[in-house]
Design a protein with these regions (language model features):
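N-terminal Rossmann-like NAD(P)+-binding subdomain of aldehyde/semialdehyde dehydrogenases
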Residues: 1-118, 311
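Conserved C-terminal structural/oligomerization subdomain of aldehyde/semialdehyde dehydrogenase
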Residues: 10-16, 205, 242, 296, ...
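Residue-level signal for inorganic ion chemistry
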Residues: 11, 32, 47, 69, ...
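Short, well-ordered beta-strand elements within core beta-sheets of diverse protein domains
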Residues: 13-20, 35-41, 131-132, 241-243, ...
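ALDH superfamily catalytic-core signature
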Residues: 14, 215-359, 422
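Structural signal for hydrophobic packing residues in well-ordered secondary-structure cores
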Residues: 36, 40, 55-62, 66, ...
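Rossmann-like NAD(P) dinucleotide-binding subdomain of oxidoreductase/dehydrogenase enzymes
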Residues: 108-251, 379
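A short hydrophobic/small-residue beta-strand
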Residues: 156-158, 333, 419
């Protein structure tokens, strides 16, 4: 079945590609396996030089690849350029730090002696071929945050990207090739979802990482579990954004707009549930709704556009279904809640939306809203805020706005999430681990924790 790239701003099919045949997939697996045998022996210096070159090339390509991303999945071109810059920065960070992150670890002399050894240490060795199943919403960043540490660790990668961003997927393969990495180090597999199982079950593939939906994560985890292969999953999120009385409410409301509307609202780490103390609720709600109304919806190729189209027609339909269900169940739409009139017949647009009077029996309370839709809650104290924040199947990240040290400590202690961001919005950075709990997945990306996920952590014990 052909793989098509469609412009979500107008529904135009830009390009189509033939999916790889079984023979072509086998060729890529053979190439990856052969490459790993030699690439795993390269030095950190050699790998860092290649990754630095890739970063330089990406910087030079920034405008071009930004336009590709925008036409493939609809993010504003300004945000696409920022994504490319972030990827280059992450490449340079891992090129600089990988050697220290994977340095041999030496137990204390006392522990070595107690074990009966003359010497002992822990070594981080590459695993082999890692399959990366990646989503469309950050088509460069999601891949680079896997590829940069994996390649620096001495692994090789196979990318099965989302089927609506094949141009970006092929660009990434070409980027690493132009940087000087051996051809089998990083390969894009233009395949449909049904072909993933065969690749993952292949004995040459030793591990998999997936960023995407819960159903996709369940499928990959099930197959990998059957084959006893390591996996890292980063799935959905419905992050709480809690505002307490000592917060700078004006700043919190301004950041809330960015946190909800970034990437057209299609971000797993976007704040989605806004939980506000009653003492500052009215002030926050007024500022937040005003900010959401002021967002410029339009052509994502225009420099002044804040919110472009959703990535697919089905994605918009799913979002509309959640909003309509909430309204039917008694929720109040404070702004938005419909397709913008100017784009009613062109593209997959949806107005920035704020909904209040949410109850816990509504679907919108339990499910992830993947688009520019915010739910607004009023609470009476911190206990109620934490309880409501944790009332979700997801546990990716969280935000709290307060200048009370005791509240910060309490929130960080009791929130069920992989991240806590105080007086700021959630954002990933190569120095800090990223990942979630509950149905948001398991394992970590980025930082020392991320690069070690796909390493064979080896104990070397030497006796007399």
């Amino acid at each position: 079945m052909p793989i098509a790239t469609v412009n979500p701003a107008n529904g135009e099919t830009l390009k189509t590609y033939d999916a790889l045949t079984d023979e072509e997939i086998e060729h890529r697996l053979l190439l990856a396996a052969g490459t790993f045998r030699t690439y795993r022996t390269t030095t950190f210096f050699e790998r860092a030089r290649l990754l630095q070159t890739a970063a330089d090339l990406l910087d030079a390509d920034r405008d071009d690849i930004a336009r590709v991303m925008t036409t493939e999945m609809g993010k504003p071109v300004v945000a696409a350029r920022a994504e490319a810059a972030k990827c280059a920065k992450a490449m340079r960070w891992y090129a600089e730090h990988a050697q220290e992150l994977l340095a041999d670890e030496h137990p204390s002399a006392r522990d070595v002696e107690d074990s009966g050894a003359v010497s002992a240490h822990v070594r981080y060795r590459p695993l082999g071929i890692v399959l990366a199943v990646m989503p469309w919403n950050f088509p460069l960043w999601q891949v680079v945050r896997f590829a940069a540490p994996a390649l620096m660790a001495g692994n090789v990668g196979l990318l099965k990207h989302a089927s609506n961003v094949p141009q970006t997927a092929l660009y990434l393969q070409d980027l690493f090739r132009r940087a000087g990495f051996p051809d089998g180090c990083f390969q894009t597999l233009l395949i449909g979802s049904r072909a993933v199982e065969g690749v993952l079950r292949d004995e040459r593939v030793v591990a998999a990482t997936l960023t995407g939906s819960e159903p996709a994560g369940r499928s990959v985890a099930s197959i990998a579990g059957d084959e006893v292969k390591k996996t890292v999953l980063e799935l959905g999120g419905s992050d709480p954004f809690v505002v307490l009385p000592t917060a700078d409410v004006a700043k919190a409301a301004k950041v809330a707009v960015t946190a909800r509307a970034q990437n057209n609202g299609q971000s797993c780490i976007a704040a989605k549930r806004f939980i506000v103390h009653t003492d500052v609720y009215d002030e926050f709600a007024e500022l937040f709704v005003s900010g959401m109304r002021a967002l410029r919806v339009g052509d994502p190729m225009e420099e002044n556009t804040d919110v472009g189209p959703l990535a697919s027609e089905q994605g918009r339909a799913d979002l509309e279904e959640l909003v309509d269900d909430a309204v039917e169940c008694g929720a109040t739409v404070l702004c938005g809640g419909q397709r913008p009139e100017a784009y009613a017949k062109s593209g997959w647009y949806y107005e920035p939306t704020v909904i209040a009077d949410i109850t816990q029996d509504m679907r919108i309370h339990r499910e992830e809203t993947f688009g520019p839709v915010a739910t607004l809650y009023r609470v009476g104290d911190l206990d109620e805020a934490v309880t409501l924040a944790n009332d979700s199947p997801f546990g990716l990240s969280s935000n709290v706005w307060t200048h009370d040290a005791a509240e910060i400590d309490r929130f960080a202690r009791d929130i069920e999430a992989g991240g806590v961001y105080v007086n700021g919005m959630t954002a990933s950075h190569p120095a800090f681990p990223f990942g979630g709990i509950k149905r948001s997945g398991y394992g970590r990306e980025l930082s020392a924790h991320g690069i070690r996920e796909f390493c064979n952590i080896t104990t070397v014990w030497v006796g007399a």
